[in-house]
């Protein structure tokens, strides 16, 4: 069975956007990078941060998720179960000792519309604010990063008009609580576009309304193509959302999210697949992902030629792979 696939390597770091001119004399590395430190890849992500400390000023440990059950808001620690032999205080001390600001990320760990409904009441918003603020103060974090993607990808866009004002009220309350203690509020969201263009993007996140009260906006300028082969973060699309962001808030608040991965789409299958891969090697199946730094070796291993797309400003390559083995009917 012959598989034909298309690979598009698209890094995850976050790059700060600044409109200030660079200094010509005595140039020093500018600490313009930030990045997520996932709980599931500490052995590689933490060394990567420390090896680039001259460029990185802050990190977002991707370690927490918000839950709501039994009328109680709680924040679940994802780090400890994944790293039982290394106490959470160890990497925190290492990063603090390196002079990094620590702004952990909290994801939405609730089911469809649960967080939206929670934020629809003053009591619900205050419960969420208190839980998050307590996490920050108890651990002496420098702030918090909200990555509540369920609004965009789970709840459905028909809920956005209802959710939007509750979200804005919540962000304002959380900002006030954090700022009262000298802490920062960072927001991570998918893209938005200038509504005057007729295209809004994920407008539920209300950038214009929350801009005055947030300290960081981290834009997910990746995952442009997921289900079908295509660019991961095409330049024109990225520029459009950035132009809108800096038109409504200082550029110093805006961080550009860059993908650190590529996607491997199966575009065509010839023949009958062996039984052990028949369910996964299917044209149109969910794309596998790989680490960006492995892209060149992957292409070389298949004898593929990497091509650069001038329009999208991304690289891509296609390759063929042959699978041998018995089919489900016993044929080889």
Per-segment meaning from a language model:
Residues 260-332:
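Glycan-binding loop/region signatures in secreted carbohydrate-active enzymes
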Residues 32-40, 171-204, 253-259:
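Aromatic-lined carbohydrate-recognition surfaces of secreted/lumenal glycan-active proteins
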Residues 63, 131-163, 216-229:
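Active-site groove signature of glycoside hydrolases
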Residues 33-35, 57-61, 102-106, 144-146, ...:
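Hydrophobic faces of well-ordered beta-strands that scaffold small-molecule active sites
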Residues 52-73, 204-232:
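Aromatic- and acid-rich polysaccharide-binding/catalytic face
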Residues 120-144, 166-177, 198-213:
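An active-site-proximal structural segment forming one wall of the substrate-binding cleft
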Residues 25-134:
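Glycan-recognition patch characteristic of GH18 chitinases/ENGases
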Residues 44-46, 190-221, 226, 262-283:
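Substrate-binding cleft/loops of secretory-pathway carbohydrate-active enzymes
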């Amino acid at each position: 069975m012959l598989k034909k696939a298309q690979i598009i390597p698209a890094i995850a770091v976050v790059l700060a956007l600044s409109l200030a001119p660079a200094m010509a004399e005595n140039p020093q590395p500018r600490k313009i990078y930030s990045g997520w430190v996932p709980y599931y890849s500490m052995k590689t992500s933490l060394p990567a941060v420390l090896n680039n400390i001259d460029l990185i000023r802050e990190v977002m440990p991707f370690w927490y998720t918000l839950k709501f059950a039994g009328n109680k808001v709680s924040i679940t620690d994802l780090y400890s179960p994944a790293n039982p032999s290394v106490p959470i205080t160890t990497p925190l001390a290492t990063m603090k000792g390196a002079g990094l600001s620590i702004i952990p990320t909290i994801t939405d760990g609730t089911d469809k519309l649960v967080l939206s409904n929670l934020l629809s009441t003053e009591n619900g918003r205050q419960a969420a604010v208190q839980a998050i603020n307590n996490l920050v103060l108890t651990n002496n974090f420098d702030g918090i990063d909200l990555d509540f993607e369920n609004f965009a990808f789970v709840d459905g866009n028909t809920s956005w008009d209802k959710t939007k004002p509750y979200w804005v009220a919540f962000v304002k309350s959380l900002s006030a609580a954090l700022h009262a203690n000298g802490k920062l509020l960072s927001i991570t969201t998918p893209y938005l576009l200038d509504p005057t263009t007729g295209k809004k993007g994920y407008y539920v996140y209300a950038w214009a309304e929350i801009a005055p009260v947030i300290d960081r906006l981290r834009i997910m300028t990746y995952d442009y193509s997921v289900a079908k082969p295509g660019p991961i973060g095409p330049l024109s699309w990225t520029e459009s959302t950035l132009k809108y962001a800096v038109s409504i808030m200082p550029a110093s608040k805006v961080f550009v999210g860059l993908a650190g991965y590529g996607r491997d789409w199966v575009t065509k299958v010839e023949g009958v697949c062996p039984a052990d891969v028949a369910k996964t090697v299917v044209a149109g199946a969910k794309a596998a992902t790989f680490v960006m730094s492995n892209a060149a070796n992957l292409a070389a291993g298949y004898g593929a030629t990497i091509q650069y797309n001038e329009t999208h400003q991304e690289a891509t390559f296609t390759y063929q792979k042959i699978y041998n083995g018995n089919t489900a009917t016993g044929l080889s």
